[in-house]
Amino acid sequence: MSPPAAIYEPTVAATGLKGKVVVSETAPVEGASQTKLLDHFGGKWDEFKFAPIRESQVSRAMTRRYFEDLDKYAESDVVIVGAGSCGLSTAYVLAKARPDLKIAIVEASVSPGGGAWLGGQLFSAMVMRRPAEVFLNELGVPYEEDANPNYVVVKHASLFTSTLMSKVLSFPNVKLFNATAVEDLITRPTENGNPQIAGVVVNWTLVTLHHDDHSCMDPNTINAPVIISTTGHDGPFGAFCAKRLVSMGSVDKLGGMRGLDMNSAEDAIVKNTREVTKGLIIGGMELSEIDGFNRMGPTFGAMVLSGVKAAEEALKVFDERQRECAE
């Protein structure tokens, strides 16, 4: 568990602004050296030399581990599509609650994190409405409190995202496949005619982007009884699973995301995060494309708490979906 948060009163900045800052209790131990790396390397650069290596050793070290992961996670317990703030939050809660589950995260971009590296309009600060600060406390991410008690501010959105990512990828039961796109869903027939989702069809993102100008490049697959899609609003890879449900006939049409209304949007996204068809849970902004909710703009509380709700929904149905997909 992350250490508890501590609150301290900072000095007034040059701007004249002053606010309560919440930080995790990770201060250095008194008396410990704060120059360990300098003590180790400093003043010794003339004789510095890396350990010798053969180029093939590098190739084999990378390849062996990656293909071991491909083999291991070809049959996963949960696949999370999209590694933005919602997907990573889902992975964190799931991996911590169920260390026995194999959780694969598939992210189309080289760099996970989605839009959570910045706040609105490419600004560095990130705003979260209460009670989402509970999630920040869990991670140990510091934040500032303004006079208005209804929200908190993370000074650098990148600190939140990098902290969350580092914790998620530290779990031994999580594997991130970045630069990998989901091209389709694996389905199974059901009695009511709506397909049950039983996995994802994947390919290198660079291959996916060039299907129109190259010959056939078939994909790969990952089986899993529960898929959690958090691919964001409509875009080249956004709202992928939502759009695929329409083309498969499982959903008549998309609701279409409506104009910006923070107050209605965030509550709606969190409350309605759910299993939309057997084996497929949708959360985050992708849900607005299904249900026609408003967009929320540059506030991130709903993303992380939708992730918490998605994890809860997955835990509710996992055992049943696993039995159904056992064949």
Swiss-Prot record:
Any one cellular-component term (Gene Ontology): cytosol
Record's comment on post-translational modification: During the catalytic reaction, a sulfide is transferred from Cys-216 to a reaction intermediate, generating a dehydroalanine residue.
Name of the protein: Thiamine thiazole synthase
Cofactor(s) listed: Fe cation
Compartment(s): Cytoplasm; Nucleus
Modified residues (2,3-didehydroalanine (Cys)): C216
Enzyme class, UniProt record, top EC level: transferase
Gene responsible for this protein: thiA
Family: Belongs to the THI4 family.
Function: Involved in biosynthesis of the thiamine precursor thiazole. Catalyzes the conversion of NAD and glycine to adenosine diphosphate 5-(2-hydroxyethyl)-4-methylthiazole-2-carboxylic acid (ADT), an adenylated thiazole intermediate. The reaction includes an iron-dependent sulfide transfer from a conserved cysteine residue of the protein to a thiazole intermediate. The enzyme can only undergo a single turnover, which suggests it is a suicide enzyme. May have additional roles in adaptation to various stress conditions and in DNA damage tolerance.
Biological processes annotated in GO: mitochondrial genome maintenance; thiamine biosynthetic process; thiazole biosynthetic process
Nucleus recorded as keyword: yes
Record-annotated membrane-spanning stretches: none
Any Pfam family the entry gives: Thi4
Cofactor: binding comment: Binds 1 Fe cation per subunit.
Residues annotated to bind substrate: C86, E107, A108, G115, V182, D218, H233, M285, R295, M296, G297
Species annotation: Aspergillus oryzae (strain ATCC 42149 / RIB 40)
Residue ranges the record marks as coiled coil: none
EC numbers for this chain: 2.4.2.60
InterPro entries noted in UniProt: FAD/NAD-bd_sf, Sti35, Thi4_fam
Catalysed transformations (reactions): [ADP-thiazole synthase]-L-cysteine + glycine + NAD(+) = [ADP-thiazole synthase]-dehydroalanine + ADP-5-ethyl-4-methylthiazole-2-carboxylate + nicotinamide + 3 H2O + 2 H(+)
UniProt-recorded Gene Ontology molecular function terms: cysteine-dependent adenosine diphosphate thiazole synthase activity; ferrous iron binding
Annotated keywords: Cytoplasm, Iron, Metal-binding, NAD, Nucleus, Thiamine biosynthesis, Transferase
Self-association and partners: Homooctamer.
